[in-house]
Each structure stands twice: as structure tokens, then as C-alpha cells.
Amino acid sequence: MILSKLSFRHVKSRISQPYVNISVLRPYSSKKSANKWILPNLTKLNETKEHTVTKQKRITKSGLDESDRELLVSLNSGPRMHADWRKMKTLPEWKRQKFALVEKLQGSKWNPKKKLSRDTIEGIRLLKEKLPELKADYFAEQFQVSPEAVRRILKSRWEPTLEERENIEERWKRRGVKHLQLKIKEQLLKTVKEKGEKSEDDRKTIESEFEDDVIVNK
């Protein structure tokens, strides 16, 4: 009985006792915090960046042999191409393709004068798909273009949209009319020069009549 009363009093006193949160107070440092923020030296940062980039380039080029490095510098310095560039084992692939194209074109720039229409391009691709044994030289001879132009046509997979196709067809119509007008002028000049019967005014009149007829019937 006495023990039960004592335990009840102990529980009651523990419940009624208020909870006190004791926090440990830490003294602040006597040092003052720096209020001024110092900007970094941008000049030194740029110099460090340039030095790093230069160092990386040197490391990249250091993978080449001494003879290959000299040959690569000579190739980059001018349009001349070394005869032994194929023997360079460390030459990048894009360089090999570039030199092979220059060698194939015999130093001339890639600028084909003759343009093929979109229908002709699609016809060449269709023939190549149906008859894979046909070579680029065969198509070049048939369509009177360079073999490199045929290779580029067969390699490309670009297809125009409906709007782009309409614009291409419109350009080809204008190009055809202009080409026909030039042919007519050349034929007129040749005829007048051979016969010598028409005067300058008559020649201009005939040219204008042919041009009007082409514009009406285009």
C-alpha cells in the first residue's frame, strides 16, 4: 500500500513538472566577418584558359610522329598535296577524304556547271536501286555530268517537302524558259549572220517576237 502511494506520487510529480528546454549557448567569435567581396582577376583567368587550350592542342599533336607532323604542317600550309599522304597512319579520316577528293578532281574545285532536275536525280536513284551493277561512270556518260556528281547524288538521302518540291519545279520552269530564250537568240544570230539579209532592226524585231511567243506559251 505504501509502495503504491509512493509510485503514484512520483508519477504525479513527474507529470506536473514543467518541461524546460536547456540549450547550450555558444559564444560568438570575436573576429569580424568580411563584408567586401574581392572580384577575381579576369586577365589571369583568360591567360590560364588560353594556356590550357594551347597545352591540350600540343598534347593532341604530340601523338603524331615527327615525320607525320612535318607532313601535316606542309599539307595545312598550302594547297599542295604530298605524294605519300596515303602512307600516314595517324592522318585523320576527314583529311584522307579531303585529299582523295582533291586528287580525284585533279586540283579543280567542286563546282558542277550542269545541274540535273529533281526528276532526273530521282530517276538515277531508282535505276541504281533496280540495277545495282550500273556504275557512276555509266550514269555520268548518259547524263553528261561528272562521275563525282553522280556519286554525290547516290550518296545523298535528302528528300524535299511538298512546298520545297513546288519551289524547285517553279525554278526549273523559269530556268527552262530562260534557256529556251538563249537558244532562240543564238539561232537567230547564226541565221542572220549566215544569210546577211536582215538588218539590225529586223533582227531585234524577230527576237522580240520569239520572246513574246515563249512567254505566252510557257
Swiss-Prot record:
Key word Transit peptide present: yes
Highest taxon of source: Eukaryota
Transit peptide endpoints, chain numbering: 1-28
Coarse class of the protein's main subcellular location: mitochondrion
GO CC annotations, alphabetized: mitochondrion; nucleus
Subcellular location: Mitochondrion
InterPro entries assigned to the protein according to its UniProt record, in alphabetical order: NGRN/Rrg9
Pfam families per UniProt: Neugrin
Keywords: Mitochondrion, Transit peptide
Function text: Required for respiratory activity and maintenance and expression of the mitochondrial genome.
Family as reported in the entry's similarity comment: Belongs to the RRG9 family.
Protein name: Required for respiratory growth protein 9, mitochondrial
Organism listed in the record: Komagataella phaffii (strain GS115 / ATCC 20864)
